[in-house]
Structure formats: C-alpha cells, structure tokens
Amino acid sequence: MIESDRIITASPFSSQEEVIERALRPVQLDDYVGQEKIREQLKIFIEAARLRQEALDHVLLFGPPGLGKTTLAHIIAREMGVNLRQTSGPVLERAGDLAALLTNLETNDVLFIDEIHRLSPVVEEILYPAMEDYQLDIMIGEGAAARSVKIDLPSFTLVGATTRAGMLTNPLRDRFGIVSRLEFYTADELGKIVTRSAGLLNVDVTADGAREIACRSRGTPRIANRLLRRVRDFAEVRANGRIDRPVADAALQMLDVDATGLDVLDRKLLLAVLEKFGGGPVGVDNLAAAINEERDTIEEVLEPYLIQQGFLQRTPRGRMATTMAYQHFDIIPSHQTTVPSLFDPD
C-alpha cells in the first residue's frame, strides 16, 4: 500500500482536498480546539507583541503531520494583523529564492516555512542573520571580485513547521524564541472538531456519531475531517443522510478503519513484528523490508501513533510489540517471548 493512498494518512491527498481543509480551518485562536497550553501561550505572546508594536518572536512548531501547524501559522498572522507568506523547505533550493521572499516582506509580516528541516545548508546560512539581526547578507560577484553586501530587512516573524525536529541544526533551532510541540488530540477534542466541521459542511451528525469518527481518527484533526467526508458519502447513499453511531461504524468498517483507528498498513506492520519476528526486537530496516515500505514511512507515519497508543515500543535493540498488540490480534505470546508493557523502560 502506498502511504498517500491511505484514508487515514495525515498528508493531504490533492489540491482539491487542501481547498476543503482551508475552508474548515479556524481563523482565530478562540475557535481553535485542542493544544490548550500552546493556544494560551500564543494569546499572551501575540498580545504582548501587538502592545509593543513589535514582530512576534520566531516560532517553531513541531509534531506529527495533520495536527494544525499550518493552521496555527495562519492564525498567528491573522491575530497579529499582518500578511502571511508561505513556502516550504524543499522549494527554497537557492539562496536567491529565500532572499526574494525576505526582501518582499512588510513590517512584522509572518514568513511560514513548512518542512523547515529540509532547508539546504546554503539557504539556512542566509536565514541566520535574517532571523537574528533582520539583515540579508549576500555575496555579489565571483572569485577575487566577490564582495559581501548587507541589506536591511523589515522586522518579521519566521514560523517554521516540522515533523522532524531532531533534524534541525542547533544554530537554527536556537534562533526560535517560541518552540511548541503539538500533541495528538483527545477523542473529546476531535469530537468537537468533527461537530464544528459537520456544521460548516451542512452535515447532520449526532454526538455519538461524531464521537465514533473521533475515536478512529488517530488523534489527528486532518484525518477526522477526511473520515467525516467519507462517512457523509456513506450516509447519503446507504442511510438517510444522518450520521449516528451505527452509520459511522458501518462506514468506517467499510473503509477498513478499526475501532482503534488502525488500518491495513498498521495491522500489517504489527503482524509482521508479532508473527515474522516473534514480537521483536526487530530493526526498522528489516521491518521495512518485511512489509515492503520505506523506512521514513515507518518512522514518520506509522510509528508515532502506534507508540503513542501503546501497540509498539522503540528500544535500543529495535521495535517490540507490547502486550496490547498481542491482545488486539488475540495472539498468545510464545513462552520464549518477553512481552514489554507500555511502561517498561527502553
């Protein structure tokens, strides 16, 4: 299975879906559900910056995909009353690409760089003085005739987003004044998000119907909204258009998303650990080969949720299935297997 084909992937499927997602995004912090600590911190920091008529400190947002990093970047710009310029690390191939963006910023604007961990070293070097001193330091000419030129920039806020905070260099990470980790959402929070999105989409959903979708959304708003749209389709064709718990359950079973939010690929990974490797430990490269997936897909897409839910444990010797994984598949461990619980030390 290709990761982008999964109904429960946190990555956008298409430009059309991105348009729908934008329509469902909250536009101010008061409408933002979840991430309470981050939301309260940003309220204070934004209000203080506005009172001083200064740019907000540079902000680094990190965590698994689909949790609202892009949404928060848009909200920050809106709450500050400034423009948002958006790009991504892979797009900024040359120093000139970043220089063009920086020189077109207006005072206190927000520059949002998604996947900031994928910036090239040469682009990152340009970013250091821009973040620290609001200056652009570029080289003009080549060889003996080359000279450094400093260009003053307006004050601005860089908002960086990444799913791989550990891949950021220390000099870049240290230049962010506000660093926030986004966590998976609770079922209650996702239920509120599903209910809000259903209202915007004119979908009739009951509280228990919204809860059923929320419980299978892997703690991720983007997945919750995607499942809501697919359950809506099912309800319109197979039911009376109203989403209650039985309708949501039937639709999600059809989509092969089980009660814990696991799909075919999740189950394939866990069963490989359980059956092919005796519950582990198994190295990630061997595991990737066993299920015919990329290492990055396992580390960035599958593992975070499986570990967070207690199905998988990452140890110095490799990945191990937990007691919960054995119970989920009704598999009895062999007597040789030492099964870790969620609270065993790594």
UniProtKB/Swiss-Prot annotation:
It holds the Pfam family RuvB_C. Residues 259-346 are annotated as: Head domain (RuvB-H). InterPro entries: AAA+_ATPase (IPR003593), AAA_lid_4 (IPR041445), DNA_helicase_Holl-junc_RuvB (IPR004605), P-loop_NTPase (IPR027417), RuvB-like_N (IPR008824), RuvB_C (IPR008823), WH-like_DNA-bd_sf (IPR036388), WH_DNA-bd_sf (IPR036390). SUPFAM superfamilies: P-loop containing nucleoside triphosphate hydrolases, Winged helix' DNA-binding domain. It catalyses: ATP + H2O = ADP + phosphate + H(+). It comes from the Bacteria. ATP binds at residues 24-25, 66, 69-71, 132-134, 175, 185, 222. CDD domains: AAA. Its EC number is 3.6.4.-. Mg(2+) binds at residue 70. GO terms for molecular function: ATP binding; ATP hydrolysis activity; four-way junction DNA binding; four-way junction helicase activity. DNA binds at residues 295, 314, 319. Residues 186-256 are annotated as: Small ATPAse domain (RuvB-S). Residues 4-185 are annotated as: Large ATPase domain (RuvB-L). One of its GO terms (biological process) is DNA recombination. GO terms for cellular component: cytoplasm; Holliday junction resolvase complex. Keywords: ATP-binding, Cytoplasm, DNA damage, DNA recombination, DNA repair, DNA-binding, Hydrolase, Nucleotide-binding. Belongs to the RuvB family. Homohexamer. Forms an RuvA(8)-RuvB(12)-Holliday junction (HJ) complex. HJ DNA is sandwiched between 2 RuvA tetramers; dsDNA enters through RuvA and exits via RuvB. An RuvB hexamer assembles on each DNA strand where it exits the tetramer. Each RuvB hexamer is contacted by two RuvA subunits (via domain III) on 2 adjacent RuvB subunits; this complex drives branch migration. In the full resolvosome a probable DNA-RuvA(4)-RuvB(12)-RuvC(2) complex forms which resolves the HJ. Has 3 domains, the large (RuvB-L) and small ATPase (RuvB-S) domains and the C-terminal head (RuvB-H) domain. The head domain binds DNA, while the ATPase domains jointly bind ATP, ADP or are empty depending on the state of the subunit in the translocation cycle. During a single DNA translocation step the structure of each domain remains the same, but their relative positions change. NCBIfam families: PRK00080.1, ruvB. The RuvA-RuvB-RuvC complex processes Holliday junction (HJ) DNA during genetic recombination and DNA repair, while the RuvA-RuvB complex plays an important role in the rescue of blocked DNA replication forks via replication fork reversal (RFR). RuvA specifically binds to HJ cruciform DNA, conferring on it an open structure. The RuvB hexamer acts as an ATP-dependent pump, pulling dsDNA into and through the RuvAB complex. RuvB forms 2 homohexamers on either side of HJ DNA bound by 1 or 2 RuvA tetramers; 4 subunits per hexamer contact DNA at a time. This is Holliday junction branch migration complex subunit RuvB. It comes from Nitrosomonas europaea (strain ATCC 19718 / CIP 103999 / KCTC 2705 / NBRC 14298).
